[in-house]
Amino acid sequence: MKFPYTRMRRLRKNSKIRSLVKETTLSKDDLIYPVFVKEGIKTKEKIPKMPGQYRYSVDELIDEAKKLEEKGLKAILVFGIPKKKDKYGSSAYDPNGIVQKSVKLLKEETDLVVITDVCLCQYTEHGHCGIVKNKKIVNDETLKYLSKVALSHAEAGADVVAPSDMMDGRVKAIREELEKNGFDDVIIMSYSAKYASSFYEPFRSAVYSSPAFGDRSTYQMDPPNSLEALREVKLDIDEGADIVMVKPALPYLDIIRLVKDTFGVPTAAYNVSGEYSMIKAAIDANYLSNKVIIETLLSIKRAGADLIITHFAPEIVEEI
């Protein structure tokens, strides 16, 4: 059909008609809110590079989680900030560690889906995501420590564990550890295609996890690559991942679509700290209106993400 028989504007003539033919819808069910929890009590500490985000003590986190649950939030992703760091990241798998305490209380006090970040970078003296020997991040030895972290989170009550380290074979190691200990129903949401991105800087500042030497390019993915992402995702699925993830989201919308179209499995995308801070800065400077938040998240959903991890969740959960 050609003009004038086909007029595309007919389906745009008012908001109700536009809603009827809308192809992509953003829902509260899509959102996961990443939170930072630290030792102490009655602490809610501003994060300078992430306006509107905070480091919470456990009691403050519980209060915030309850408020967000009342507004319709369904899921939360917990990142710990320990008091003590060492070369093995032992605070990460301490049964009385900050994440473990938070998970127990979140499960007692809320009905939220509780997801935990499984990594070592916040917990090690050197800030890398694995065990370091002679300034090299050793892969296979790291796996047993990551498995211990995941198991400790499952024992605390986590619904989902989310390995973010990008070590080869970590999903298999974690799945085997969970199965061996009777946690066969704990979900693994793997950071499958996690790129070595410059958009992580505000997060690293928030959790004090910048590497003491070098960078993470020997284990995180190289930004120019897309077919490599498919190999990473397939390996994680084969090793037992239930949900796969692309991180960051906005510079990698093509990867989200590629992963979703290729595998058709539940796919998460992480709208990371740098994306958040960049948009917040533009809004705060009146360069953009806050309408760009919804537009941004819609682009991630439209690209194929089933789940969106975003620091914007508290701002928009009541809007959608």
Curated annotation (Swiss-Prot):
Q: Which cofactor does it need?
A: Zn(2+)
Q: Which GO CC annotations does the UniProt entry carry? A: cytosol
The positions annotated for binding 5-aminolevulinate 1 are: 204, 216
Q: Which PROSITE patterns match?
A: D_ALA_DEHYDRATASE
Residue positions annotated to bind Mg(2+) are: 232
Q: What organism does the UniProt record list as the source?
A: Methanothermus sociabilis
Entry-linked NCBIfam families? PRK09283.1
Kindly report, in one word, the top-level EC class recorded for this enzyme.
lyase
Q: How is the cofactor bound?
A: Binds 1 zinc ion per monomer.
Report a single Gene Ontology molecular function.
Answer: porphobilinogen synthase activity
Please tell me where Zn(2+) binds in this chain.
Answer: 119, 121, 129
Subunit arrangement? Answer: Homooctamer.
Q: Active-site positions, per UniProt?
A: 194 (schiff-base intermediate with substrate), 247 (schiff-base intermediate with substrate)
- What does the sequence similarity comment in the record state about its family? Belongs to the ALAD family.
Per its database record, what is this protein's job?
A: Catalyzes an early step in the biosynthesis of tetrapyrroles. Binds two molecules of 5-aminolevulinate per subunit, each at a distinct site, and catalyzes their condensation to form porphobilinogen.
Question: What keywords appear on the UniProt entry?
Answer: Heme biosynthesis, Lyase, Magnesium, Metal-binding, Porphyrin biosynthesis, Zinc
> What's the EC number here?
4.2.1.24
Which PANTHER family is this protein grouped with? DELTA-AMINOLEVULINIC ACID DEHYDRATASE
User: Which Gene Ontology BP annotations are present?
Assistant: protoporphyrinogen IX biosynthetic process
Q: Which reaction does it catalyse?
A: 2 5-aminolevulinate = porphobilinogen + 2 H2O + H(+)
Q: What is the lineage of its organism?
A: Archaea, Methanobacteriati, Methanobacteriota, Methanomada group, Methanobacteria
SUPFAM superfamilies named among the record's database cross-references: Aldolase
Leader peptide range in chain numbering: none
Q: In which pathway does it act?
A: Porphyrin-containing compound metabolism; protoporphyrin-IX biosynthesis; coproporphyrinogen-III from 5-aminolevulinate: step 1/4
* Matching Pfam families: ALAD (PF00490)
* Gene this chain is encoded by: hemB
The name this protein carries in UniProt is: Delta-aminolevulinic acid dehydratase
